[in-house]
Structure formats: structure tokens, C-alpha cells
């Protein structure tokens, strides 16, 4: 069976039905969810305006209000898990990349949901990958620390002295390996795979097209923008 995307019920339909209930409990529940139906918190009270069935989907909550990020995380994690389940039924593998992973661990509900997703994903043919520049938050949370310790594949770039020492304890690194992380330069670090730990060097020349494509350094971006005639410096001339 097929359906029109515009006919899918949204939260306001549920809200209206609650208000029509003769029992006072229904109206009390309607009052409870009212902030998510009207006003600034009604972000998810609308049909989706993007195609989530594409092969490559990116979710970004950077501009989401702080009081909505917890709800946003839960909705996106649920959407991701549903996609993993659907892909498994189609015998399709799913790659899940979570940037700024430490943000998930600011919300207790998101932590629990993400812990289940991370633990069950491999059985469903998914490969979850977490990315963070703040390893301290990961280590200080019990669930995320266990996730880190039980991961089969890790890429560890340069770390501060305290973070390197803490990582060494969690994943059982030698003193020499901890020192390598402390002294690692750009593109250098340790590769942990299947119980093996290998130092690596993968520097990208700063004058290459790949470097220009992947750099996030503000000075680089300003320089490239000016070279293209799009930066403030270029416009001021």
C-alpha cells in the first residue's frame, strides 16, 4: 500500500484528539504537550520536508535551540535505528557516523538510546562510528567508556597529557604508546584494530586539493575565500 506523505498524522493531530476527550486526563495530557505543538518548541510538529530515503542522509542539530536538543537527539536516534532495521531487511549495510559524539552524553535519555543502538548495530549489519575532540567527556561517562573499551577499531590522534593518560588506562596502552599520543603532530597517531596497536603517519600536504577540501581551520578558510574573491578581505580590497 502507498500513502501520501502529507496525510501522515503529526503531533497537532494527537493534541486535537486529546482535547476532544471527555476525560480530564486527556486534556491534562494535551496541556503537557502543548509547548511542542505551538510556538518555538513546535519544530517537529510538521511533516518532514526532506527525502530521508536517499543513500546519504545528514542530520545537523547545531542551530537547534538548547531546550530542544534533547528531543532532537531522541528523534534522530530513533530515525537512525529505524533506517538500520529497514536496511537489514533489504540485506543492505548501514554506515552511521556521529560527529561531536560527546554531545550525546549530555542527555540521560539519549545516552540510554545510543548505548542500545551502539550495542545492537553490528547484529543488524550496521557500522557505527563516533567522532570527538573531547575524549574526556567520553571517558568520564560509564556507558561511553565501556563503548570505547569494547570498540574493535580506533583512530587516536594527538591528545593532551591528561587525556592520553586516561585513554591509556581505558584501552590498556603502554607508556610508550601514551607518549606517542602526547607528542603526535597533525596526521599522526595510533591505530587500534583487532587488538593490535600501530603508530601511523598520514599527513596531507597543505598545497593539495584534498587538504583544501577537508580543512576546517578558520585561517585556511579565510585565505581560500579571499583567493576566490568571496571573502570580506577580498571585497574590501
Regions found by a protein language model. Name each.
Residues 1-126, 139-142, 180-184, 189-195:
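P-loop NTPase motor domains
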